[in-house]
Amino acid sequence: MAFKSALVDSFRGEMAKTKDPTMINESQFDVGYPTGYLAFDFINGTKVEVRTEKTSYTYNSIGIVDGTMVSMIGRAGCGKTTLTLQMAGNIVRPFENGMIMHEELETGSASTRKRQLLRMTEEEFKAKYVSRNTGINTENFFERIKTLHDLKVNNREIYEYDTGLCDTQGNRIFKLQPTVVILDSLAMLMPRDLTEGGEIAGSMTITSVAKVNTQLVKRIIPLLKSANIIWFMINHILPDPSPIPKKAQVAWLKIGERCPGGETAIYLANNLLRIDDSSKLSADKDLGINGINVDIQLVKSRTKRPGVSVPMILDYDTGFSPELSLYALLKKHKKINGAGAYLYIGDHSDHKFSQKNILKELKDPEFAKIFMDASFEVLETLISSGTTNTNIEEQDDTVVDITSMMLSSMMDQMAS
């Protein structure tokens, strides 16, 4: 059945007459950028159903949505900056004009450590990574993002690429190559007059700093989508100093916890990730590394239901391990059987291993395939959970639309 609205057609025609792109442009179809950590990518992903007269298929759109803000929250030492850098590197590395702009208000790691986490060669690091750790304030941080935005949207012919994906109607999706901005951290960001010698005890109080940063977030958000800038905002979970317990700023923050910098940074985030570290790991046992178990919880998401968490493994030497994190996911979903040095995946009891040697075992192609197949099986359950069929014609005909029936009955009564 073909649908047509005279008002919609007339409205679009009037907008076209303005010749103003800001008036003409409509919402762009979202594209996900994998972070390299598949458990998170899938819990934040969606299934896209492409349906045209000639073809019909579904694909997984996983990872961080283009042109969005992601808040990373957690206590000190839980791995927020490490994970953010690794995710950022995995997003931009495949692109010729990919770029990371890192604002390090809390000083930062050595360049060699950052390059290791980004998994970049020395040449890539120099070409794609821009950082500063002095002279940062609210005003010039905005100016730098605005410059990035203007450079990209005014030179689309340089930065635009074919994603290779289609929207639900089969139209090819084109995007500007992604740029990642990292602010580390919001709690340390202050206005220029305060950083350049203003009196802390003067008119600029903690509350007014939060208000200025709130305006910053509101000004930056509209710039992100059109330029495909992904903004990672690192923030802390701090104890609430209030003597009277009050409702948490957002669900899945506990009573007595707060995030500094104002509530707008929470409400306007496309994703809010809570990072919680737990038990330590030692090289002489466990997984054969010195590190820690970490849970990543999707506190807020505009693509999937919130509250879902996945396990990850932080290796103190190399950062978060994609492979060990997948292994932790398989354990959580009870795909690892056996005990001690005689573990096996699923029903593959002919391929036994010790978890301390799991990384070595993955070098065996046959074992790697078993591992990947089991991982895909679990990941598919993560992306399917909370995803609904958007094709109206194919929705379950056993579902009864009570609301429509009641409204129709009311209209019938009025007509009689």
Task: Mark where each language-model region is.
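Terminal-proximal interaction/regulatory segments of ATP-powered molecular machines
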Residues: 341-416
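Short linear loop/turn motifs
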Residues: 56-62, 127-136, 339-356
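Conserved, well-folded catalytic cores of nucleic-acid-processing
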Residues: 43-50, 75, 87-95, 116-121, ...
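Conserved inter-motif catalytic segment of the P-loop NTP-binding fold
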Residues: 91, 95-205
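Phosphate-binding/switch region of NTP-binding enzymes
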Residues: 206-333
